[in-house]
A protein has these predicted regions:
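ATP-binding N-terminal substructure of ATP-dependent carboxylate-amine bond-forming enzymes
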Residues: 1-107, 111-112, 116-118, 122, ...
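Active-site nucleotide/adenylate-binding loops and adjacent lid/helix of ATP-dependent enzymes
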Residues: 2-12, 16, 24, 116-205, ...
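Glycine-rich phosphate/pyrophosphate-binding beta-alpha loops
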Residues: 87, 227-230, 295-309
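Phosphate-binding site of ATP-dependent enzymes
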Residues: 178-262, 283-290
C-alpha cells in the first residue's frame, strides 16, 4: 500500500520587523522540500490573520483551534510545522507553546529554549555558567534608564560598545557606540524594538556563523561562513542588502575550526536544541572564540548562510530537511 504524503506547513510571517524576510525564507524552503515525499504549504501568520496559500493564488483561513484549513470543501490537518519566522511569535517560544498544546510536531527547539535564546542577555548569562566565552554586557530596562549612568557603562563595558534590543529576532535597533554622547540616542533607538536593551562589549576579530543539526542517528556541524562587511558591523543593511562578503568555508586554521565545531556541538547539547540552528562567533587574533548569538530559525533563502553551508558540505537541502522532519516521527 502506498504511504500517504505528510502535510507540511512552512509557517512564516510573524509580527516582527523581519516579516518580509521570513516570507523569503518560506519561498526558499518551499523550493528545497522534497515534494515527491511531502505535500508542502506556506502558512503566513500576522496578528490575527492566519492563512494558507493554495494553488491558483487563493488563500484559506487557518482554524486556530487545530491549525486546520478547508480545501475543496474538505478539512485538512497538518502533520508537521516547519517554523521560519524571524522574531515573535516563532522565535521566542509563543508559537511553540501553541503547537505543543494542539500536539503538532515542529522543526524548532521547545518553548524554554526558544524563549532563552531569543533573550540575548539571558542566553549570555546562562552559557557563561557552562564556560562558554561571551562578551561582557549589562541590561537596561525601559523606565529605569537613570539607574545606569553613562560613566558606569564606559567603566564596566568600555568604548566602543554595542547597544541592542535584548529580545529581538533581527539586527533592527542595533547601534555601535563610539563615545558617551552616542549612548542616549542608541538606547532610545533600541527601545523602539524591545523594552529591555543590552549594552555589550565590542569584541574585535573575525566574525563567523556556523550551522548545526542533530537527529537520533547523526550529528552534522556544517562548514562555517566568514562574514566580511564594509559596514560598522553586520547590521540589517549588510545582512539583506548585499553589503557583505560571505566566505564559505571560513578562512580559519585547523585548530580554530576544530574548536569552533566542538563548541557549536556543545552549545546545541547544553541548550537541548532541536532542528537546525546557527551560532555566530567572534574569533580574536589570539584565537579566542566568543559566542555572539544563537539563531534558532535561521534564514533559508537560497543565498542565506545555512543553504550556503549545506552546499559547501556536499549535502542537499532536500535531504537535510527530510532528516529534520522525519526525526520527529
Amino acid at each position: 500500500m502506498k504511504h500517504l504524503k505528510r502535510n507540511i506547513a512552512i509557517v512564516c510571517g510573524g509580527d516582527s520587523s523581519e516579516h518580509d524576510v521570513s516570507l523569503r525564507s518560506a519561498q526558499g524552503l518551499y523550493s528545497f522540500f522534497d515534494t515527491e515525499r511531502y505535500n508542502v504549504y506556506i502558512v503566513d501568520i500576522k496578528g490575527q490573520d492566519w492563512h494558507v496559500e493554495l494553488p491558483g493564488g487563493i488563500t484559506a483561513r487557518i482554524d486556530r483551534n487545530d491549525f486546520s484549513f478547508v480545501e475543496d470543501g474538505k478539512a485538512k490537518l497538518f502533520d508537521y510545522a516547519y517554523i521560519t519566522i524571524h522574531g515573535t511569535p516563532g522565535e521566542n517560544g509563543l508559537l511553540q507553546g501553541y503547537f505543543d498544546l494542539i500536539g503538532l510536531p515542529y522543526s524548532t527547539s521547545g518553548v524554554l529554549v526558544e524563549a532563552m535564546t531569543f533573550d540575548k542577555f539571558v542566553l549570555n548569562q546562562y552559557l557563561r555558567g557552562y564556560g562558554v566565552s561571551v562578551a561582557d554586557s549589562l541590561l537596561i530596562r525601559q523606565g529605569y534608564e537613570e539607574l545606569v549612568s553613562d560613566d558606569e557603562i564606559e567603566q564596566r563595558i568600555g568604548m566602543p560598545c554595542f547597544v541592542k534590543p535584548a529580545a529581538d529576532g533581527s539586527s533592527f535597533g542595533v547601534s555601535k557606540v563610539k563615545n558617551k554622547d552616542q549612548l542616549a540616542p542608541a538606547i532610545r533607538k533600541a527601545m523602539l524594538e524591545s523594552p529591555e536593551i543590552m549594552v555589550e562589549q565590542f569584541l574585535e576579530g573575525t566574525e563567523i556563523s556556523i550551522g548545526v543539526y542533530k537527529t537520533h542517528d547523526k550529528s552534522v556541524v556544517l562548514p562555517a561562513t566568514e562574514v566580511v562587511t564594509a559596514n560598522e558591523f553586520f547590521d540589517y543593511d549588510a545582512k539583506y542588502n548585499g553589503q557583505v562578503q560571505e566566505i564559505t568555508p571560513a578562512r580559519l586554521s585547523e585548530d580554530v575550526t576544530r574548536r569552533v565545531r566542538e563548541i557549536t556541538s556543545h552549545i546545541y547539547d547544553i541548550l537541548h536544541c532541536n532542528g537546525i540552528i546557527r551560532i555566530d562567533y567572534i574569533i580574536s587574533k589570539e584565537g579566542k572564540i566568543s559566542m555572539l548569538e544563537v539563531n534558532t530559525t535561521p534564514g533559508m533563502t537560497p543565498t542565506s548562510f545555512i543553504p550556503q553551508q549545506v552546499r559547501a558540505a556536499g549535502l542537499e537541502m532536500k535531504d537535510v530537511l527530510t532528516d529534520i522532519v522525519e526525526n520527529q516521527f
